[in-house]
């Protein structure tokens, strides 16, 4: 039997993160851990250890593998053009979210208290934030970041169901960024 390590339970973190954000959107800021830690590990460790060992979302997808059809994922999922294109798309969405946060911070836009799936479909969770709890820009960032995290997790679960477990990992934007960092550190061509 395989020895269990503390990091084998990080899938629970993904569930806790979404549960906390469901009740108070300001907890969405905790998702920055999942955004920054893989980059730091790649920058300072030169490896994809986060993806391979510590990614709670990847572990959750593996746990949900029993719901998978176990079909081979399309080869283009792992192709450079798809991975880099998907990364560019997600970074664009992240940039728009940061810009919206800036507009709210500068007083040029009002707080949009909305969680959106796929950046289009508003989720009717009106109880996630009480106005005045934090600065409007802090809440705006939380709404946007939670939307991105929820959208990417739902995409991952759909892909996981249609194909093999962790098929999402083949084109995950964080995985693509950490792979790029590792290749650059090793002097390899992107």
Predicted features by range, described:
Residues 1-190:
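Non-ligating segments of multi-cofactor redox enzymes
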């Amino acid at each position: 039997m395989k020895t269990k390590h503390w990091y084998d339970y990080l899938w629970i973190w993904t569930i806790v993160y979404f549960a906390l954000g469901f009740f108070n959107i300001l907890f969405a800021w905790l998702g920055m851990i999942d955004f920054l830690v893989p980059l730091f590990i790649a920058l300072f460790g030169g490896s994809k250890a986060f993806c391979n060992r510590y990614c709670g979302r990847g572990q959750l997808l593996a746990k949900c593998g029993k719901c998978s059809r176990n079909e081979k994922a399309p080869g283009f999922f792992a192709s450079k053009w798809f991975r880099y294109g998907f990364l560019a798309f997600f970074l664009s969405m992240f940039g728009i979210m940061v810009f919206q946060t800036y507009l709210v911070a500068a007083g040029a836009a009002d707080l949009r208290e909305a969680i959106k799936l796929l950046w289009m479909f508003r989720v009717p969770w009106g109880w996630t934030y009480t106005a005045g709890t934090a600065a409007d820009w802090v809440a705006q960032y939380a709404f946007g970041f939670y939307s991105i995290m929820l959208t990417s997790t739902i995409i991952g679960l759909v892909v996981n169901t249609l194909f093999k477990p962790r098929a999402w990992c083949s084109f995950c934007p964080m995985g693509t960024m950490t792979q790029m960092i590792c290749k650059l550190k090793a002097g390899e061509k992107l």
